[in-house]
């Protein structure tokens, strides 16, 4: 189920519209996405604008990935699928805002891919072909007995 509403940081005109706050809804429960992002080796956004409504979920993650002292073990593969060049530029503006203007460090510290699904040449792109090939390799790896044996060790 989806709960639509406004974020806690937005003024509700002296509380008159507090009922519209997501967190005030009795059916609202949030998933601690920040922990998942911190632990993930790879993060994929598909069709997500990273806009203002969800900004607070992702800003700490993107800020951390732009730190100058980021250790190699904290490097992430971050892949964003969007529709076209206009939406890609909107996402770039949002990322620039989220990370205090350190967008170049986001590329430097991580494997950052932004793919436009509306681009008819997407499948020809070397970076997309590499990303896709890596996903196929990972799918094959998790289908092996060794993968399950390794999980059982923990």
Segments and roles (model prediction):
Residues 1-25, 39:
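Extended, H/D-rich, highly charged conserved domains that either
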Residues 25-31:
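Active-site-adjacent structural elements in folded domains
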Residues 31-154:
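SIR2/sirtuin-family catalytic core signature
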């Amino acid at each position: 189920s989806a709960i639509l509403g406004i974020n806690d940081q937005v003024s509700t005109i002296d509380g008159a519209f507090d009922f519209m706050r997501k967190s005030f809804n009795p059916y609202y429960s949030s998933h601690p996405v920040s922990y998942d992002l911190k632990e993930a080796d790879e993060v994929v956004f598909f069709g997500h604008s990273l806009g203002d409504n969800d900004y607070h979920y992702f800003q700490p993650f993107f800020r951390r990935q732009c730190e100058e002292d980021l250790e190699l073990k904290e490097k992430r593969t971050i892949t964003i699928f969007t529709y076209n060049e206009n939406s890609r530029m909107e996402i770039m503006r949002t990322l620039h805002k989220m990370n205090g203007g350190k967008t170049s460090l986001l590329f430097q510290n991580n494997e950052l891919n932004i793919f436009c699904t509306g681009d008819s040449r997407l499948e020809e792109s070397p970076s997309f072909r590499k990303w896709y090939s890596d996903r196929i390799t990972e799918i094959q790896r998790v289908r092996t007995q060794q993968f399950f044996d390794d999980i059982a060790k923990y």
